[in-house]
Each structure stands twice: as structure tokens, then as C-alpha cells.
Amino acid sequence: MGGNMEDVKMKCGLEIHVQIDTKSKLFCNCSTNYLDAEPNTNVCPVCLGLPGAKPLPPNKKAVEVAIMVAKMLGCKIVVDEDIYFQRKHYDYPDLPSGYQRTSTPIGVDGEFMGIGIHEVHLEEDPGQYNPSFGIVDYNRSGTPLIEIVTKPDIKSPEEAREFLKQLMTLFRYLGCLRGEGTMRADVNISIEYMGVQGNRVEVKNVNSIKGVYKVLKYELIRQKNIIKRGGEVKRETRAFLESQMITKAMRSKETAEDYRYIPDPDIQPIVISEKWVKEIEEKMPETPLAKKKRFVEEYGIDEEDAKVLVSDLDMAEMFEEVVKSLGVNKENVDLAVTWIRNELRRSLQYHKVDLYESGVKAEHIVELIKLIKEGVISQKIAKEIVDLLVINRGKKMPKELVEELGLTVIRDEDALVKAVEEAIKNNPKAVEDYLNGKKEALNFLMGQVMRLTRGRADPKRVIELLKERLDK
């Protein structure tokens, strides 16, 4: 399967479910810690859907988080109206009551990154079913979820991926994610090709940003090929087989009527007042967009650097801490950008580790920059130290690593002169090029000196010594 995809028009809408960090579940006092607990220990009659079990009123923190999320996505909050919890009926082993409780919208008609937000609401997570062994763990049952339903405005897999990355960054800024952040998405996609509009297909329970991207890439090709052969894209629900990176038909597409929504008679509706919304707004943190704007204005960095820094809350906070510790001026800001946004980020990506788990803190970078400014280490050695910090999970400070490994800048002038003369002797072609006016040959010779000294030479002094000998 393949071919040119430029002639295919894609429409995609996402239903995104994000677990939020509350101590207790949405409708009972059971712990939400299902990852570390023994199976079926953090449960009660409400979690297990036992007859006669009465749910508590909705978890207040979960409602407040839903309001915050809706506000940050530009939604209008549904105020002074009853917000009901409904029973959404379907049969599956992880749903002991036979229905899932889900609220009517808390926020509507928003926009984020140019993608329309249809609604934001709360719902409870079902349990965890393992079909391979036929066992169910209900510890997760009742954990609060935020569901964000987008409009079908997404036009490409790449746009979907970027949207989800920025959305998860938003949740991290709110500080409401459980652990590293658990996200699942139902992906709705249809295409138009050769003048034919295909039916909408839903792919259920895709549990990663990468998965959503792969689903859309696969479905674009699959649906295009069906239309190309004169067939009809079926309106259906499909499953994502992550191990094979393909989708597989599950059943015909459900409608709202299939779920038999009814208001839950055991839960009183909630009403959000304007006063409550204002109180929540006062507690809301700075958004990534606002932080990016402030970094550009306050520190004078360019927009691309600011965008990269604020895409990771830990990195943004480290940048500010480093700059304030060193003193806010252009030199220190530039150094902080270089060693955090460029070098530390490079090392983290290479070693496939996130900043928050790397053990590298602001004080490590502050000490590293001071060693550079004081001429104790060269730029090349500083890059090695960054890698060592990541590898060793920040267990040792830069100064300690430099002393242990003998990485300080060479102060012995005779040793430096010897390395310079050796580089000149071993590279006659570069010497000839320099004497013929090719100034870049000087940089090559400097690189040879740095290689001979294992990066411990002072580049400025090396250039001076090279010129003294070559310009005679």
C-alpha cells in the first residue's frame, strides 16, 4: 500500500481521555493508586457496581480540574445550569455495573492550536481487562478522567501528533496528570479521494501519541485504496493492533442511541457558579503560550528557543532558575539557552531519558557554566560533562567530574606549544591552504590540536599560537 497522499483530504476528530491526579475516585473514597496495589484491593461496592451501592457526590477536585482544562482550551464554561452525570450503557467485562458514568459538558466551543474543541467533560475509568487470561482488575474502576472531544478539524497525522503533544504539555503545566500522564484516544477519521467522500471510521483506545499518528497514517492508506478500487469505506469501529501498527475491524459504528444514555438517578446534578469559576481562575498556573511570550520579552531569547524551552515544564523552570542564579544579563541568558536548550536536550534525546528522571538539576548547569566562564574547562569538555551528568543521573557535580577525570584546561604552555607544532607538522596540506588564503584551514588545524589535547586546550590560545607560527 502506498502512493501520493497529497490528493487525499483527511478529516479527523479525537476523543481524548486523560487520567487526572486525585487521591480518591470520582464517586467513592477508594484510592486511585491502581498501579502499585494488589489486584482488586482498592475497591468498594460502588467501584464494583454492586446492587444498592450508592455513589458519593462527584469528587470536587476532579470537577475543578475539568474547569481549568476547559478554560485553558478556550471553552465557555457551562455556568448556572445543571450538569448531569449520565449512564452510558455497554457490556464489557471491565465495566461491572454495565454502564459508565459520564457528565454532560462542563466546557464547550473552545479552540486550541487552531483545532476546535467541541466539549470537555468528566467520566469514570473502567477496570482493566486482560483478555489473554480472562481476568479483570477493578482497582482502576472509578478513577476520574477528563474527556476532550475535538471538532473534525485535524487535517493530517502530523497535525494530530503536534496537537496531542501540546495538549499533554498543557496538562503538565496544570500539574494534574497521574504519574507520567496516561492518555487514551478514540480516533475518528474520514477521507475524500477522487471526488468520493468516505464514511467515518472510529479506531478505539489508542494509548499513545505515536499510536494516534500511526493509526492515521495507516487509515489514510487503507481508506484511499478502498476508494481507488471502487469500494465503499464502511462506517465501523476498529481496533489498533499496536504490535503490527495496523487497525482491525471490531463492529459496526455505534450511535448515541446504542449507548442508551439516561441521567443517573443516584447522583445529584452539579451547578458551576461564576464565583466558583473566578476562584479557580485565580489558582490557574501560567500557560505554555504565556510563558513563551514572557521568555521572549523578559529574557530577549528568540521565539524558537522559547518554544522549545516551554514545551517541557521542567526545562522551562530549570532555565529560569539557572539565569536567576547566574544573574540576568545577555551573556548568562545565551549560555543558559546553549547548555539547556541545545546541549542538555541533545544528551537527553540521545540517551532516551526525560529531564525529570535524569537527575540533572539547575545547580549542575549553573556550576558547569561557571567552570566555562572561569576558563577551567573548554566547550568540548563541557559537552562531555553534560553527557556524564545524564549517564550518572546527576549523582556527581560537574566540578567533581572534571577533577576526577583530569579534564581541566591545559595551563602548561610548553605542552600546548608541542601540540600546536605537532598539528602543523602532521598537516602540511592544511598549512598550505591557510598560507594561500583559505582561512577555514585554521579551524581545521585548531581541531587537530584539540584532538591531540583531548579537548583540554583553550581554543583562543590555540588560535594565537597557530597564527604566531603560520604568519611568520
From Swiss-Prot:
Keywords: ATP-binding, Ligase, Nucleotide-binding, Protein biosynthesis. SMART domains: GatB_Yqey. One of its GO terms (biological process) is translation. One of its GO terms (molecular function) is glutaminyl-tRNA synthase (glutamine-hydrolyzing) activity. It comes from the Archaea. InterPro entries: Asn/Gln-tRNA_amidoTrfase_suB/E, Asn/Gln-tRNA_Trfase_suB/E_cat, Asn/Gln_amidotransferase, Asn/Gln_tRNA_amidoTrase-B-like, GatB, GatB_C_1, GatB_Yqey_C_2, Gln-tRNA_amidoTrfase_suB_CS. It is an enzyme of class 6 (ligase). It catalyses: L-glutamyl-tRNA(Gln) + L-glutamine + ATP + H2O = L-glutaminyl-tRNA(Gln) + L-glutamate + ADP + phosphate + H(+); L-aspartyl-tRNA(Asn) + L-glutamine + ATP + H2O = L-asparaginyl-tRNA(Asn) + L-glutamate + ADP + phosphate + 2 H(+). Its EC number is 6.3.5.-. Belongs to the GatB/GatE family. GatB subfamily. Heterotrimer of A, B and C subunits. Allows the formation of correctly charged Asn-tRNA(Asn) or Gln-tRNA(Gln) through the transamidation of misacylated Asp-tRNA(Asn) or Glu-tRNA(Gln) in organisms which lack either or both of asparaginyl-tRNA or glutaminyl-tRNA synthetases. The reaction takes place in the presence of glutamine and ATP through an activated phospho-Asp-tRNA(Asn) or phospho-Glu-tRNA(Gln). This is Aspartyl/glutamyl-tRNA(Asn/Gln) amidotransferase subunit B.
